[in-house]
Design a protein with these regions (language model features):
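Extracellular low-complexity Ser/Thr/Asn/Gly-rich intrinsically disordered segments
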Residues: 1-191
Length: 191
């Protein structure tokens, strides 16, 4: 809360002492400031109070403002790894995948119009929304035969997100041997 809220509340003014309190009375009396990370005690929406003092004034002059904390759920996507498989047509361990084929399974019943789905080659990039896979509809794996890619599902309204993984598998084609010619006897003479 503190860093982003402090800047917005101070609005560029210097020499301000800003403290956060659970109740209006605590803010007015400068009691029980919130000094650590704060876990809301009222689900989804809670008002806390921000006390602001000018450190250059020797008298106890202060103002306070209400700050509404809004907690949004993260998307409840499918936590189990999805998988996509293709055949290794040229026996090199690489194949072309349409990652979007996993969208429905990953969304786990969520409305696709409310979420943005992006894919990444590692978990860190998925968490930070950095370096997405540019062509998820035509992605060639970068690790032969088996590779994990990560999917990030972000709520368009709240920007809350969740991640999961997808296993890509390139299946080797069966090795065939040329059979010997099959000789049959034509007992009925049809040819």
């Amino acid at each position: 809360i503190r860093d982003s809220s402090d800047e917005a509340i101070a609005n560029g003014l210097p020499n301000l002492l800003i403290s956060y309190h659970e109740t209006q009375a605590d803010a007015e009396n400068n009691l029980f400031p919130i000094t650590e990370e704060y876990d809301n005690i009222v689900a989804y929406q809670q008002t806390i109070y921000v006390r602001v003092e000018d450190t250059t004034i020797t008298t106890d002059c202060f103002s306070y403002v209400e700050l509404l904390l809004v907690v949004n759920d993260v998307p409840q996507i499918n936590p189990d790894s999805s998988s996509l498989e293709v055949c290794d047509d040229d026996t090199d361990g690489f194949g072309l995948f349409d990652l979007s084929l996993s969208n429905e399974e990953v969304l786990n019943g969520l409305d696709p119009s409310e979420f943005t789905i992006t894919y990444y080659e590692n978990a860190e990039n998925a968490e930070n929304a950095e370096n997405p896979i540019i062509t998820p509809f035509a992605y060639t794996n970068i690790t032969a035969f088996n590779q994990t890619v990560w999917v990030r599902v972000e709520n368009n309204a709240t920007e809350c997100y969740n991640t999961s993984s997808i296993e890509l598998t390139v299946n080797e084609l069966p090795v065939l041997t040329q059979p010997d010619p099959l000789n049959l006897c034509d007992y009925n003479n049809p040819g």
